[in-house]
């Protein structure tokens, strides 16, 4: 239960009203939101009597301010403490004030008054309404390629090529090692790296039903409590692949892919020196073939994955790079986004960010929380400002096939595309993709 005296956000008040309208009792709402029952009752009544207009808080002291009756030295010291020690809360600041000999004999503000003053001076952290992304449930696995686990091993030192981050893909049910991709000269694989290894996997095996991911920033927006899907996430959705995020740290979830990282290191890397990136990739591919075809797995009663599950050598959904543009279905993305909801605070000039895109709500809506949903029929964001009862619409940005396809687009749409020497990461990725393209002359 939250501490008495904390202030509810506008998004929380909206949720209180909507939960009440949906049939939940005050006590059920208090338990779900971890807020005191009187707080729930207060805002539920406001919503019941006045609708959304009643949810705008009019809290605050008169113009004198939260510490208007106290000497300026104390208020100045409170601000100074908070600026120097951002982690100090009202209770810590009050305790430090009482120890300061300069303020001996003066009347001190209460902890609540200090909290109100810091809020008035905008020296407190803004708490956002938490809204999870829609996702499929954790499946009961019954067949190969029902779910792949995808994860990067992290930075490791490899003799001959330096440091690398290796991205691995594993089919959970059959234990087939799908692919491994070394990303050199980086500690963190990016969106294009993951698209490359996934495309290689799709070419080799076809499209899986579902992929599970952790909360790495490439997959998931960790900077907000109501995240918008990343480009990689939307690309998979457009291809008709379900995306599920793990909700427990390994080994509770993703234990297999973590063990697979160790297997790849032991089988392909330890004690080896490589002439370059192509040599390293060849070694990884060769050992994965050995593990899938020959190596007896204890989890499969001593059989290799392809022996235990011959059908795992190909999914039911074939894929080619040349087909990707036509395979991408933006309506799948629109349908997915229609189940989402996002809360964003506008800036002093009325702008806000959503999905790495910048939008302008207008200066009259500056410093307000927007309650945002998506209309799949028009492809627009529907924005309801905190201080208004009427929504407005903005055209969504960054949802074209060109944006989702990324580096593959020029390779498949331009009749003659001259590859650069593979000295940069992008040039190397393009050269790898071309190996899987039909009618390509290298």
Predicted regions and their residues:
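Mobile-element integrase/transposase regions
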Residues: 68, 72-73, 116-178, 189-197, ...
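Short alpha-helical "recognition helix" segments of helix-turn-helix
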Residues: 29-33, 93
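RNase H-like two-metal-ion nuclease catalytic core shared by retroviral integrases
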Residues: 213, 222-266, 277-280, 285
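Short, Lys/Arg-enriched anionic-surface-contact patches
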Residues: 1-14, 65-72
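Short, amphipathic alpha-helical "recognition" segments used to contact nucleic acids or chromatin
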Residues: 8-24, 75-84
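C-terminal, beta-rich DNA-binding module of retroviral/retroelements integrases
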Residues: 292-442
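Basic, flexible linker segments flanking DNA-binding modules
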Residues: 55-150, 155, 311
């Amino acid at each position: 239960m939250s501490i008495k005296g904390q202030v509810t956000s506008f998004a929380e008040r909206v949720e209180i009203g909507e939960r009440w309208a949906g049939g939940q009792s005050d006590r059920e709402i208090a338990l779900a939101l971890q807020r005191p029952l009187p707080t729930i009752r207060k805002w539920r009544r406001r919503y019941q009597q006045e609708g959304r207009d009643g949810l705008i808080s009019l809290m605050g002291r008169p113009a004198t301010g939260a510490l208007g009756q106290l000497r300026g030295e104390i208020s100045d010291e409170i601000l100074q403490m908070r600026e120097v020690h951002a982690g100090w809360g009202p209770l810590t600041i009050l305790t430090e004030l009482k120890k300061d000999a300069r303020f001996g004999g003066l009347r001190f503000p209460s902890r609540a008054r200090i909290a109100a003053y810091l809020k008035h001076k905008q020296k407190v952290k803004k708490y956002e309404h938490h809204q999870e992304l829609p996702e499929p449930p954790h499946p009961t696995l019954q067949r190969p390629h029902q779910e792949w686990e995808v994860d990067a091993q992290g930075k490791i030192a490899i003799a001959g090529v330096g440091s690398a981050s290796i991205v691995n893909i594993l089919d959970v049910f059959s234990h087939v090692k799908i692919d491994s991709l070394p990303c050199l000269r980086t500690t963190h694989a990016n969106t294009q790296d993951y698209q490359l290894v996934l495309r290689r996997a799709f070419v080799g095996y076809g499209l899986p039903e579902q992929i599970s991911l952790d909360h790495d920033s490439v997959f998931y927006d960790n900077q907000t409590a109501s995240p918008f899907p990343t480009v990689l996430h939307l690309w998979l959705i457009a291809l008709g692949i379900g995306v599920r995020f793990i909700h427990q740290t390994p080994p509770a979830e993703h234990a297999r892919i973590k063990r697979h990282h160790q297997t790849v290191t032991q089988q392909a890397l330890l004690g080896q020196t490589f002439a370059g990136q192509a040599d390293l990739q060849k070694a990884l591919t060769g050992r994965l073939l050995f593990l899938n075809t020959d190596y007896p797995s204890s989890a499969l009663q001593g059989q290799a994955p392809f022996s235990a599950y011959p059908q795992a050598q190909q999914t039911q959904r074939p894929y080619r790079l040349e087909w990707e543009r036509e395979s991408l279905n933006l309506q799948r993305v629109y349908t997915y986004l229609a189940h989402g909801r996002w809360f964003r605070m506008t800036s002093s000039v009325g702008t806000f960010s959503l999905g790495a895109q910048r939008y302008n709500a207008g200066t009259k809506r500056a410093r307000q929380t927007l309650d945002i949903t998506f209309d799949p029929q028009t492809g627009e964001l529907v924005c309801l400002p905190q201080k208004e009862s009427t929504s407005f619409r903005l055209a969504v940005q960054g949802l074209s096939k060109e944006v989702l396809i990324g580096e593959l687009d020029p390779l498949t749409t331009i009749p003659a595309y001259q590859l650069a020497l593979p000295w940069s990461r992008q040039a190397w990725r393009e050269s790898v993709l071309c190996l899987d393209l039909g009618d390509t002359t290298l």
